[in-house]
Amino acid sequence: MSYVDAFYESGKDTVTVVERVNGERIIKDVKPEHNFYYGDPNGKHKSIFGEPVTEVRCNSQKDFKKNLGICKHNGLYESDIRPVQKVLERDYLNIDPPKLQTAFFDIEVDFDPTRGYSTPEDAFSPITSIGIYLQWMDAMICLAVPPKTLTWEQAHEVASPLSEVKLFRTEKEMLDVFLSVIEDADVLSGWNSESYDIPYVINRIIRTMGKSETRRMCLLKKLPKERKFTLYGKETQSFDLVGRVHLDYLELYRKYNYEERHSYRLDYIGEMEVGEKKVVYEGSLDRLYNHDFLKFLEYNIQDVMLLDKMDKKLQFIDLANIIAHENTVLLPVTMGAVATTEQAIINEAHRRGMVVPDKAKGERERDTAAGAFVATPKKGYHEWVGSMDLNSLYPSVFRALNMAPETIVGQLRLDYTEEEIANAQKLEKRSFADAWHGKFGTNEFEFVK
């Protein structure tokens, strides 16, 4: 017994938990705990700072808010922990994670000669094919609408070598079957699916079938929740699913792979990890769709199979699943760092019989700067070059210090430097770190430059 997803419904004052038990999906409503603590010299509980606190237990969210108003001037503890988090910690701490049923998917989109390729936000072009791999069934399915260059009979004949292909006359029919195929999936995953496949599919469902049908992407007839985020300086649309989990495998790879890659294209990563690339073709994907439909289908299938093969090797979804259940957080929460760490601290504090204070309100966020000064760099050779770009340290070293594998011209023996450091340690009784004081590089570097 363990959870896949959970969400709080304020109208019913319940937490709905989706479980996967022995291959079966179980959905149940759980009564959440409405409790908090406040500072009290006579309190029987202790905070992580050793301060005495008193617990307040409430029967409903309404009573909870009422009591918060009464006690807020005494200093609040754990009043900002969400009901879902309280339920997961109470009911699922130290319980093994479930065996998730994962569906990898990838879409291909038509090309409009006059308007070009459409974006997920303005999904004016229809989806031409959807590849889906149901990992728990070891089943590959490719749904496709044939190009207008082929008759219905010709399309069937062309696709006949691929038993996993099912053809449709309209995009609407194809999307309807897609929603049926993923019905028993716990996790949907694609490559760059957060900013492309998920929003594109949902927006095409809205255009062809109506907004109400997007509920089938979630469970319990819930609508996907639209979310905006900034990607490469541009506001991007995505959707969060409810009851079913979406994990972008590109983001999983970025997070859990231990080294930076020069490119994060699926073609490059697939070759790096499993020795396979995308299907190679000449010209545009639109030309491939219209003039070599069989290879187009193979292209879509290979993209999805690459994801499955990489996951079988890397097991990043399993890793996210383990981290989520070790810390009693939801799977999507593991894509960040702060919320998972916070819950881990809360769980450990409770294990020690302590409670944690509410998070400080973001007063700093209200402080804004009028602007910033950017100095014009002086051309030429500079010593003592530093960089704070820790997120992209390797390329920063390229730019700032001209240090890269292709710039190596030889190696220097550090005889002079090692002798100087050794003498400073032995004769002057200085520490190793102190012996380097005032030196930016080795003596040999100074000689060569």
Feature map (PLM): residue ranges:
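Short helix/loop capping segments that flank catalytic or ligand/cofactor-binding pockets
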Residues: D112-R115, I141-C142, I198-P199, K255-N257, ...
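Conserved catalytic core of nucleic-acid polymerases
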Residues: C71, Y77-D80, L390-L393, M403-A404, ...
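Conserved RNase H-like, two-metal-ion catalytic cores of nucleic-acid enzymes
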Residues: Y3-K46, Q85, E89-V187
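Short glycine-rich phosphate-binding loop at a beta-alpha junction
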Residues: D186-E194
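Common nucleic-acid-contacting/processivity interface regions adjacent to the catalytic cores
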Residues: R287-L414, E418-E419, N423
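Active-site-proximal helix-loop-helix substrate-binding element of RNase H-like nuclease domains
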Residues: A139-L143, T149-V165, R169, L188, ...
